[in-house]
């Protein structure tokens, strides 16, 4: 198996607080891992670095052999912990955006997952509960054929 993710000596500081201190890990393609730790231990910080959302860190992160950037984002499917849709949007708008943005997005799979969650593409984001929005976001990220 090939190395899908390699994190080497990553340190991230927020002013004087070290959120990550010399973290190293590898993940082989085809493997599933859990990232466990107490609140404030740097799990979210590490995930954001891997996704290219945080840039000011020390060390090296390689995704499929490449530095974090535009190419790595194409093979990562990320579920943020906050809603990132605009209230005026409809589900069908977001489906169209995802289809345009991600070559690996499987719209039919997304619609199947949405059906399981009892979500309709005619629904307006503003009218959805927090739980419904979370189910929709999960449907979106699970419908990409991303490597990571």
Regions found by a protein language model. Give the residues of each.
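The feature captures the beta-strand-to-loop junction immediately N-terminal to the Walker
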Residues: 33-38
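ABC-family P-loop ATPase nucleotide-binding domains
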Residues: 82-137
């Amino acid at each position: 198996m090939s190395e899908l993710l390699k994190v080497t000596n990553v340190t991230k500081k927020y002013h004087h607080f070290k959120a990550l201190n010399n973290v190293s890990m590898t993940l082989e393609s085809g493997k599933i891992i859990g990232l466990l730790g107490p609140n404030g231990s740097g799990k979210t910080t590490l995930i954001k670095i891997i996704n290219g959302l945080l840039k000011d860190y020390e060390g090296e992160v390689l995704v499929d052999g490449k530095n974090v950037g535009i190419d790595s984002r194409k093979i990562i499917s990320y579920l943020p912990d906050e809603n990132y849709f605009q209230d005026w949007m409809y589900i069908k708008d977001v489906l169209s955006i995802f289809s345009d943005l991600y070559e690996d997005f499987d719209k039919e799979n997304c619609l199947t997952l949405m059906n399981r969650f009892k979500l309709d593409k005619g629904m307006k984001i503003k009218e959805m509960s927090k739980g419904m929005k979370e189910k929709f976001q999960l449907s979106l990220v699970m419908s990409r054929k991303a490597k990571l």
